[in-house]
């Protein structure tokens, strides 16, 4: 969960997890009974995020058995020339054999040993749809144990002001999401995941940002198979409290943040859909700029160090005075959350476009690829106005129409992640009427007018070569 949780077997603690929403587990001999355990004390804190923090078990609990010697982990690092570096971690000394299977289950390469390099002849590359998200399987055996790891062969890199996938300039057409549904909150639902992925395809989108935490592993498996790009984000949300509190001095977060980042990368390292790591969402980078840099830049370096595929790394920023931010400009891709026309310059789209362009001129000077990692407008489904007034479906269309036109003028602007895929629940408050209504779909997945506009827009934007 987003808060601390503990796993007990027969009332004995065997594992715990402190808010990374990734995974945790433990070796155990015997037949267990598993129950959720509450902390002895419920600390009073100051949460700073805009989604409902559900409690309970959200994702599958799996009990499995292994031989005495078994495979603990597999790492796959493929290259577009067909060479594949692999490493198999085992608990013993039994010999390891690996075989690469193609999408039809045919063996195309094999090797012996816990690590090495093998070559796939006439390799098929993984690409997002409408390309082919081709998947291979590394079939590893160690004694009696078997481990199958799917992988895709693709490259991802930043070169100048472009993001290149398999050497081709990429444009992200994406949604920010939440694990949330009207019937069961954040509870894992494989059927809903299939529904959402089909809607992503229907919308002519190609990407998802896992705002603001790592999602269930099964969602990444689905994105691998369905050819959807993923910006994978840690649960570091809203670190900051304004000018009165320096979070980098007041809160002991750094060590835990390093652990959470390492666990996310370890879990998701083999997914071809994951093309970008996000260190966190909307921290305070403005009031204590040097302390912020000293906190975040080591995490940036750690992500590059830990990722065997060395994907690009970013940090999603949201500052009133972006000129004071000395951290975002050091990331591989500049990702900005901005609400011109909504929270800022509310309802005045002429002024909103002017403010956006003033800021984009600033980021152009950094000579980095730039993406809008969040932007949106609360929209009440069924609310219509003669003019494009705030909260109406007409305003949502006008909001995206005007801002998107500004993005298209700039060759170094490489993507847009709209906020949000669907309406979702939040804590109650004077700014929220039954949750956040910025979804392009309602909470039960019905499209608003803004979604029909974006569907048409994205149909006209190719995944590759849009701004060549």
Residue ranges and their predicted role:
Residues 1, 5-6, 10-217, 222, ...:
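Secreted/periplasmic carbohydrate-active enzymes, especially glycoside hydrolases
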Residues 10, 173, 210-211, 233, ...:
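Generic beta-strand/beta-sheet core signal
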Residues 14-17, 241-242, 287, 323, ...:
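A short beta-to-alpha transition loop/helix N-cap that caps and shapes the active-site region
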Residues 20-29, 224-229, 244-256, 291, ...:
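Aromatic- and acidic-residue-enriched segments that line the glycan-binding/catalytic groove
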Residues 42, 49-56, 68, 273-277, ...:
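Substrate-binding clefts and catalytic carboxylate motifs of secreted carbohydrate-active enzymes
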Residues 46-50, 178-191, 199, 203-211, ...:
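The substrate-binding groove and active-site-proximal loops of carbohydrate-active enzymes
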Residues 157, 214-216, 236-238, 280-283, ...:
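Active-site-proximal loop/turn and secondary-structure-junction residues that shape catalytic pockets
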Residues 227-234, 332-338:
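Short hydrophobic/aromatic-enriched beta-strand-loop microsegments
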């Amino acid at each position: 969960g987003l808060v601390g949780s503990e796993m007990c077997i027969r009332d004995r603690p065997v594992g715990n997890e402190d808010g990374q929403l990734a995974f945790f587990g433990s070796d155990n001999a015997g037949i267990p009974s598993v129950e959720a355990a509450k902390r002895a004390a419920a600390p009073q804190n100051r949460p700073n995020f805009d989604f409902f923090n559900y409690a309970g078990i959200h994702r599958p609990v799996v009990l499995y058995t292994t031989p005495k010697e078994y495979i603990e982990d597999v790492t796959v690092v493929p290259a577009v020339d067909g060479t594949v570096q692999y490493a198999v971690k085992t608990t013993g000394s039994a010999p390891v054999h690996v075989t690469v299977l193609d999408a039809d289950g045919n063996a195309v390469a094999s090797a012996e040993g816990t690590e090495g390099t093998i070559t796939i002849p006439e390799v098929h590359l993984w690409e997002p749809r409408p390309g082919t998200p081709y998947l291979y399987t590394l079939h590893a055996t160690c004694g009696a144990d078997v481990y199958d790891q799917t992988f895709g062969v693709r490259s991802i890199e930043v070169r100048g002001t472009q993001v290149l996938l398999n050497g081709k300039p990429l444009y992200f057409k994406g949604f920010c999401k939440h694990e949330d549904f009207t019937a069961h909150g954040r509870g894992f639902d494989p059927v809903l995941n299939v529904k959402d992925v089909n809607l992503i395809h229907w919308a002519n989108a190609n990407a998802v940002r896992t705002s603001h935490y790592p999602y269930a592993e099964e969602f990444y498996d689905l994105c691998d198979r369905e050819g959807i790009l993923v910006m994978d984000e840690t649960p570091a949300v809203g670190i900051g409290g304004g000018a009165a509190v320096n979070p980098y001095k007041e809160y002991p977060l750094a060590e835990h943040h390093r652990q959470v980042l390492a666990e996310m990368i370890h879990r998701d390292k083999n997914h071809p859909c994951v093309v970008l790591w996000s260190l966190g969402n909307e921290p305070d980078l403005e009031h204590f700029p040097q302390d912020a840099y000293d906190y975040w830049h080591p995490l940036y370096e750690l992500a590059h160090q830990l990722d065997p595929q060395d994907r690009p790394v970013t940090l999603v920023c949201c500052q009133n005075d972006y000129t004071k931010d000395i951290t975002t400009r050091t990331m591989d891709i500049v990702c900005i959350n901005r609400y011109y026309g909504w929270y800022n310059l509310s309802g005045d789209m002429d002024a909103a476009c002017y403010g956006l362009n003033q800021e984009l001129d600033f980021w152009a000077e950094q000579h980095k690829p730039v993406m809008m990692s969040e932007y949106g407008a609360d929209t009440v489904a069924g609310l219509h106005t003669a003019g494009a007034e705030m909260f109406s479906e007409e305003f949502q269309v006008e909001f995206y129409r005007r801002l998107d036109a500004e993005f298209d003028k700039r060759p170094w602007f490489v993507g847009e992640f709209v906020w949000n895929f669907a309406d979702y629940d939040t804590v109650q408050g004077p700014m929220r009427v039954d949750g956040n209504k910025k979804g392009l779909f309602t909470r039960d997945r019905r499209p608003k007018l803004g979604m029909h506009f974006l569907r048409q827009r994205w149909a006209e934007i190719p995944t590759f070569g849009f701004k060549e």
